[in-house]
A protein has these predicted regions:
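N-terminal secretory signal peptides and thylakoid transit peptides that target proteins
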Residues: 1-19
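C-terminal segment of N-terminal export signals and the immediately downstream linker at the start
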Residues: 22-49, 394
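Acidic (Asp/Glu)-rich catalytic clusters
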Residues: 39-40, 74-84, 112-120, 166-170, ...
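Hydrophobic faces of well-ordered beta-strands that scaffold small-molecule active sites
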Residues: 46-48, 89, 124-126, 219-221, ...
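Short, acidic/polar
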Residues: 64-81, 158-164, 233-244, 321-324
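Substrate-binding cleft and catalytic face of glycoside hydrolase catalytic domains
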Residues: 86-100, 109-226, 303
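Aromatic-rich peripheral "rim/lid" segments of glycoside hydrolase catalytic domains that contact
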Residues: 176, 181-182, 186, 191-197, ...
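Glycoside hydrolase catalytic-domain groove-lining segments
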Residues: 197-205, 214, 218, 235-240, ...
Length: 394
């Protein structure tokens, strides 16, 4: 499997000063039997998030913050470089990570990840330029004085942020421009400091600003709608948003499907079969009909209600995940898959919705001892079975 010249040259702005952080013989994820290698054989790519600190958002309820710094884990990074061709910063590009106040930016953690990606030949996704929910914005935004012309000032603040971040990292080939702006229970746009000042057009402004700052990047709306019970309202709300953006010639290229799946996930609590699968495929068909690509952006598996026995649990996770990937990969406008972590112990799900029996969740392709699990083989098998397609950057 040969990597494209563009991928080989996907270097960060800070690459010149970066030293290789993991010993490697070639560009990351090029081994034919790696997950990225198997994906690339079908015109796909595979990657994962990686963080520079304890996994999980610092303001998220229940996050303990006591796990080891994953970026200091050389075994994790070795697995990452072997298996992945794409890196997305877990939290390091979010407003709360880089905006200590209204005038300053702190890119130290993000720069570290960009240097790692450059040193190892990894493509980079960006997540996220606007998480349009107040709970995930830095506290100072709630008391910010937007002055006598709040709409104008809010637009300035937002566009300055997007232009500053996106222009700093021109190597990012795909940006989550807006994240989770549709309320699952109502299907309407979440209220935020920006929607209060500007209205729903804040989303349009964000995408136009992203296109101006990153003219060649794939621009994405990212959300966690699913086939699950009661999710029709969420799906319909996302579709209405996408339809409006396309109608208004807003520069959007793809829908990111977060894919936190499983009976203990935040997105879906029932199985992808029967009427659920019909409804989900209908949604994906409608997204495809808008001319948009589809991306799996944050895959993991919540196993909180599955059997206690690890072998039985892992087998159930693998079987369910294999079917999910088979459904998703049947769409040729889906060109890459991102996991939300590679090693169980660094998953944000370890701190979210714990199992009643107290056992630790096993949501990712590798276990706490850095050994591949049946989930890893399920993903590999899905790539082997996937129809071929043209890679996004060809």
């Amino acid at each position: 499997m040969r990597m494209s010249r563009r991928e080989m040259l996907a270097l960060s702005a800070v690459a010149a000063a970066a030293m290789p952080l993991v010993a490697r013989a070639d560009v990351a994820g090029t081994a034919p039997d790696s997950l990225n290698g198997l994906a690339a054989a079908k015109g796909l790519r595979f990657g994962s998030c990686l963080g520079t600190g304890p996994s999980g958002a610092p303001r998220q309820a229940g996050v303990t913050g006591d796990r080891a710094n994953q970026f200091d884990d050389e075994r994790l990074k070795a697995i990452f470089v072997r298996e992945c061709g794409v890196l997305v910063p877990e939290n390091e590009l979010k407003w709360y990570a880089i905006r200590p106040n209204a005038t300053d930016f702190d890119f130290a953690r993000a720069d570290k990840l960009m240097a790692f990606a450059a040193a190892n030949g990894l493509l980079v996704r960006g997540h996220t330029l606007l998480w349009n929910r107040d709970i995930w914005m830095p506290p100072w935004t709630q008391s910010y004085n937007f002055g006598p012309q709040p709409a104008k000032e809010a637009e300035r603040l937002l566009t300055t942020h997007i232009q500053t971040v996106a222009s700093r990292y021109p190597q990012v080939f795909s940006w989550d421009v807006v994240n989770e702006t549709i309320a699952p229970k109502t299907g309407e746009m979440e209220a935020s400091v920006f929607t209060k000042a500007i209205g729903p057009e804040v989303i349009d402004i964000a995408f136009h600003a992203a296109r101006a700052a990153a003219p060649k990047a794939q621009l994405v709306y990212n959300d966690y709608m699913s086939w699950g019970l009661g999710n029709k309202v969420h799906r319909d709300g996302v579709l209405r948003l996408l339809e409006r953006l396309k109608k208004n010639n807003v520069p959007i290229d793809a829908l990111g499907v977060q894919a936190h799946i499983g009976p203990g996930a935040s997105d879906s609590t029932n199985t992808l079969e029967g009427e659920n699968e019909v409804a989900w495929r209908k949604f994906l068909d409608e997204v495809t009909g808008l001319g948009l690509d589809i991306i799996i952006t944050e895959f993991d598996f919540g196993d909180q209600t599955l059997p206690a026995d690890a072998a039985a649990r892992d087998a159930a996770v693998a079987a369910t995940a294999k079917h999910y990937f088979d459904v998703m990969l049947s769409y040729k406008n889906l060109r890459y898959v991102m996991a939300w972590g590679m090693i169980d112990k660094y998953s944000w799900l370890r701190d979210r919705m714990p199992r009643a029996d107290g056992l630790l969740k096993r949501p990712l392709p590798y276990d706490d001892d850095y050994q591949p699990k049946p989930l890893r083989e399920a993903i590999a098998a899905a790539f082997r079975a996937a129809p071929e397609r043209r890679w996004l950057l060809s």
